[in-house]
Regions:
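C-terminal His-loop and adjacent cap/lid subdomain of alpha/beta-hydrolase
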Residues: 1-199
């Protein structure tokens, strides 16, 4: 039997306190895969998602590891901003004027370029594992493996996601990372035009 790991829409970009609070509140520490070098229950609150995926991929070196996201994933950016607002100790306001809408564009204090650049940094860290590949599509959709998205989303070389996954399953040498470059903030059914200009 072959094993494959697909990480979909989980770049792991969080505000400075969100990760440690989540680990503590959810009691995740005792469940850390501490048999993997570089991962420990005490270190879960500080390890980056990129380092975590790299450690898992290195440990299971014969398992292909694929990470999928969009360059401006609206749901991930929204919750990143929620973490920033919580970290700032702002007074709570029960209004979208504080939290913004879930598409991640009109969030009052959002810094989406930070989310994108950190996602790319984590992706680069994970790419240190020989069995890791990434697929970063343009746009702001959250979760790419559901419904028609799986058969319609394309990467940097116009490779369709479903075909890319099939290359992984076939063990093809053509299975390479497909990351869009110079992706502008999108205009899609889930978003509105943005004035963001991220490199």
């Amino acid at each position: 039997n072959n094993t494959y790991l697909i990480v979909d829409a989980a770049a792991g970009v969080q505000s400075s306190n969100s990760q440690s609070q989540s680990i503590a509140n959810w009691g995740a520490g005792p469940n850390a895969p501490d048999w993997i070098t570089g991962i420990s229950s005490s270190g879960l609150s500080s390890i980056t998602a990129g380092a975590f995926i790299r450690a898992v991929a290195d440990h299971y070196s014969t398992t292909p590891v694929a990470q999928l996201t969009t360059a401006y994933d609206g749901a991930q950016r929204y919750f990143y901003n929620v973490g920033l607002l919580i970290d700032s100790n702002k007074s709570y306001v029960a209004s979208s004027s504080m939290w913004g809408s879930s598409n991640g564009y009109d969030v009052a204090d959002s810094n989406s370029c930070d989310w994108k650049s950190t996602m790319e940094s984590y992706r680069s860290t994970a790419a240190g594992a020989a069995n890791y590949r990434s697929f970063t599509a343009p746009g702001d959709l959250h979760v790419l493996t559901t419904g028609s998205r799986f058969f319609e989303t394309t990467g940097s070389d116009s490779v369709v996601l479903s075909d890319w996954i099939n290359l992984m399953l076939a063990g093809s040498g053509s299975w390479t990372s497909e990351n869009c470059t110079s992706c502008s903030p999108p205009v899609t059914a889930q978003s509105s035009p943005s004035t963001l200009s991220c490199p």
